Amino acid sequence: MNIIKLIKLLLYGSLLNYVMALYQHKENVFDKFKINNEQITKPKTTRTRRSEITKIIKEIASNATHSSIHQMSVTVRVRLLNPRLPDFIKPKKYEIELTLETEEDIFYGECRIMIIIRKATQNISLHSANLEITEVILTRKIDKYIIVDKARNISYIYELQIVVLYFSEILRPGNYTLSITYKGVIANDGGFVKVSYINAIGEKKWLIVTNNSAIGMRRLFPCWDEPGLKAEFVIVVNVPYNESYNVFSNSFLLFSSTSKPLTTYYIVTPEISTYRIGIVIFDKHDYTDISPIQNLKLWRRELIEDVTCTVEHTWQLQKGYLLRKQFAITGLPDDGVDKLAFVLYREEDIIYNEKIDPIARKIESSRKIGRKVVGQLFDTAVSPSWWSCMWLNEGIATLFGVYTINQTMPDTRMLDLFVVQTQQESLRLDDSQVMNPLDSEVNSISEINSLFSFTYYIKAPSILRMLHHTVGDEIFQKGINMYMKRKTGSLDDFWTVMQSVYDSQTMDLEKINVKDLMNLWIQEKQYPILNVTEIFDSEWTKIVLETASENWTVPLTHHVYINLKRILPTFCLSREQKHFLTTCYNSEHSRFIIINRQQTGYYRVYYHLESWLRITNYLNSKNYSNINVLNRAQIIDDTFHLAISSKLNFYLFWDVVSYLKWETDYIPWYPMFKAAEYMSHILPFDNVDSKVFKMKLLMQLGPLLQKIGYEEESNDDTFIKCLRQEALRWACILDDSECKKHAEYKLRWHLLNPIKNQLLPWWREWTFCNGLCVSSISLDQLFIDLNEVSRIEYPEMMNSLACCNNTYSLRSLFDKLKKLRNDYIFSYTKDNARMISFIKNYIYWFYYVIQRHANDDSINYILLNNFEEIKPKEISTTAAVINIINYTYSGKLLCEVSFIKHNNSFHIFLLNYNTLIIFYMS
């Protein structure tokens, strides 16, 4: 046997065993995996897997030399184990020319990338998605000669969006220029995205913006699309001359020139990561309609300027540094990825009109603006070394956005809202096991895209807030400043920088290790529960703090209070300690412990029974407001979730929240409303749990509404308005008679003179729905002209009308809508928009009636016995029946859903009120 054959066999055998081992653990990576145009589909059995792998490896072994076998085997291993590109090839500079064919929704690209190769190779891998590559040329200058090599083969790894370019010769270490010619698409999954808008004179126009997803740039040009890789960019954009397009970029626009049929724009950037690039193209005559920040006249312009000035002052930046190009674009698919010196808002997210929008919208818009502006601090600053580290930058931007809005607009109480709306929601989602840990592996495209979800924007800032309060303001701010001066950074870099600042400014004998403290908080799906035990004697009280798991280090800095006075110095309950014990002198007054001051720690607190009773007694005293408002909210949220997880008896939860009848602050009420949402699934059922829940909650809502009133006044505090809206919503959901009477009164008042007695927009749906529930007002009275149905713009209004409990009125409107629908089809064929609007509202109406009345005997009877006459033709019989079943909670009513004839017959049987079997019979 000659040496070449022996090497082939050895390589073949070892590679086969190696790939088979990987196959068992990484099957999904082989889906549609392409090498040299050979397709490997996902096998179904072990034998099939072995045969197909054998086939591909035999081909590699039979057609390659020793070096190329080794090269290909390395390539396979990299693809299986690591989604990253090889680290021995790096881009230094990109020169890109893009020519848009806007009528055909395509663009042509030429990309010249200056790269450095540090290790001999025969192929180059880079990212590319939805691009049709037509030519690849690699050049290298050696002395006076330019060596040119064309790619002999191009392979795609679709799951990783990687293109592999194979060359005839081995590429030695050195500097190269990689030139690629390609074609892309202007579409939602393309390099450019088209967004429609209506300009000032009513014309429909198109705005074109670069794909705003984290990995959207690989759809615009082939590139090394990893966050830790930075390069300079020179981008030339050619747009049709006759389209009057204007180009804005997040970088320096050197100049533009016109040479029919194109207008050319030249853009350069400093060293940045690919995901920070942004380009917006639109008709220059519609500049103000696209809402650039300098032309905004609504409140948001002032807010953005105020937020920007505050951030610049806090971070000691030159005035005007952050107030650059900021655009609010209607319909923009915004995933929250920040661009360099370029803020793209989704206009719907930040528009606020005080005449039609509830105050909660203004607060939420403020939060988004704050995060976007602070995100600009990371323009040319530190980039994460890998996608899994992106949560750090996003968490910092979100948290400091909250801090900035809280400082700029203190009346928004943005920090208080952050705790109850963001941090507590994060704890709830952790309970549900629906969030991955912050520090998660990223091995696929879907995992990269999923990173930019609510996990980053609720858990990341919550964990960083805990670190902030553990190390203190000065250390936290200085540590972040130092970290941002780095070019790229990993989590270890961040912990190292923060530790360095902490050590230099802290004199404590028992210093904390920042990395050890924080690692488990970002690596685990859940959070710890801190158990608090008090042991009393005649003069002293012993306090024992412990966690169920020994793995957690729980920061308790400034978190332990007795009688609202801090009793413990800075310390952590470390993983080495089973418990922490301290003692305090008994006072004559009521004693109670508050752990986790202002809920700065990301954990729940479980007190023993006597401690719960002491806290409850104090909350039910006239001094309840002495407990910090965030701790009042924390106690409610903790007790509810301990109760539903069977760690606490529910009667304790109701004892704790019994004080709410005196509480007029929206913040502690917020977790109570969230608890009501969680328990709402039991409301349709007529059982003991449902009755107790309704009774207990109404016992708090009744006195509250008597205290704050049912009517909204213009001079009411923002949070009183929010509290009243939620309190009345839940009071009516729970069938409170006073709530329904007030709604009927407001509805009749409005209908007496709709022009003069106008309802506030955010009360309109509530008033109509709850007013119609109890009034004798007929729906025919509301629609004297049924053509008005086609002019209803918001589906929510159809939902409100479906609240009517008058059986005759509902049936009458159904009949008239059915007739009018047929009239529309025959009479309005030229007015398609009007007809479509009517049919759409009719469909909404049908579904909303089912949702509201499927459990009502009389209306359910009408639905079932007039099914074909009532059902819109656009809804299938199957879909309609399933919808009725989904909203029917009575076994008796379900049994009545027995026979509906369309093209098929449906026989539905209910077994033990739990199992539903549907037989389809022709």
Enumerate the language-model features and the residues they cover.
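Glycine/proline-rich low-complexity spacer/linker segments in large multi-domain proteins
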Residues: 73-86, 172, 179-234, 285, ...
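Hydrophobic helix-coil surface modules that form long, contiguous segments used
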Residues: 109, 212-215, 222-370, 399, ...
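Surface-exposed beta-strand/loop patches in extracellular or lumenal glycoproteins
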Residues: 114-132, 236-240, 543-555
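A surface-exposed beta-strand-loop module
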Residues: 131-200, 274, 580-587
